Amino acid sequence: MLLTLYACLLWLSTSGLWTSQAKDPDSDLSTRSRHRNLAPNNVDFAFALYKHLVASAPGKDVFLSPVSISTALAMLSLGASGYTREQLLQGLGFNLTETPEAEIHQDFQHLHSLLKGSNITSEMTMGNALFLDRSLELLESFSTGSKHYYGLEALAADFQDWAGASRQINEYIKNKTQGKIVDLFLEQDSSAMLILINYIFFKGTWTHSFPPESTREENFYVNETATVKVPMMFQSRAMKYLNDSLLPCQLVQLEYTGNETAFFILPVKGEMDTVIAGLSRDTIQRWSKSLIPSQVDLYVPKVSISGAYDLGSILGDMGIVDLLSHPTHFSGITQNALPKMSKVVHKAVLQFDEKGMEAAAPTTRGRSLHAAPKPVTVHFNRPFIVMVFDHFTWSSLFLGKIVNLT
């Protein structure tokens, strides 16, 4: 039997960060602090996982939602037994002698609720669904806990008829994501008897739009020998910018109209690995304090990217070694004995476009004739890094390494 975990992360169309004032009107400090208890562990896990994925795919695109993966693994721990449960939670950075397990799940419950409901200016759909064969039955303890803390929805499927089961799952995901993802599973034979799907659909709005009339086709330099054509968006305005003195890169910070903030990081040519190695929670906090308003001519590709990963071996390298080994380690999920779990898969899709809440004044590529400070030009026409954070919950929503835009 196969346990397949799918995180479907769709549509990024795009608000400071941890030092910013949250836009949520909730002023109850005890409530506000609960979800931020998770932030240090979640962000540390995010960068550890991101670096493992990058190392496993040199020269390729990487894109994931760390907070989504953390949430799914924490939920799985409800069905794990003994040492496996400790491995899962410790792999996420939790010290169970300092933080009671019940508190961890309560914090994730609050975080999940905030991410789903706090941003009225964006479309966001988040959820968890467990498809299990009709011969299996969930244990009441796992069913109750996973639904209460993580909103898990359990559905029966006939996995003896994989073509029919895959169509059922595809239709469910299509409906939940408003048609933004289709054909998640192909109609091919599978030994799966239980499939966990963690999905998130997000369509945000930039605070400052990119003028559509300024978008033009340009070269994107994949490497020294490969070039592809991409539509390149453009805007010229004051925005937060940094030419980092510690890591060899430039970066800009762009905001959504809600609680989200995007960092676009452009490494010096040949220094992508150096910059990625230097990414950490401390780096993000330093950047948040160091970015200063500057006049910038900004060029960003209008593209869609996607990634699919079998996380099993990577999570094993990170110390969660029992996640895929023996069925007894997850004896708390179903009343029936589970065969060996063999796959944990994460899938992500990202799209950038020009849409924003505030229309930008028409901008012209090239210099104006009247006297003005010369803008800094930041041209994302070669491999770059993108990160999206929710600055109210301090969550790492998305991390990406963009190399090839074909």
From Swiss-Prot:
Endpoints of the signal sequence: 1-22
| Keywords attached to this entry | Glycoprotein, Lipid-binding, Secreted, Signal, Steroid-binding, Transport
Sites carrying sugar chains = N95, N119, N223, N259
The feature of type site (Conserved cysteine within steroid binding domain) is located at: C249
Coiled-coil annotation reads none
Q: Where in the cell is it found?
A: Secreted
Enumerate the GO terms in the molecular function aspect.
serine-type endopeptidase inhibitor activity; steroid binding
Provide the domain comment. Answer: Proteolytic cleavage leads to an important conformation change. This reduces the affinity for steroids.
Q: What is this protein called?
A: Corticosteroid-binding globulin
**GN (gene name):** Serpina6
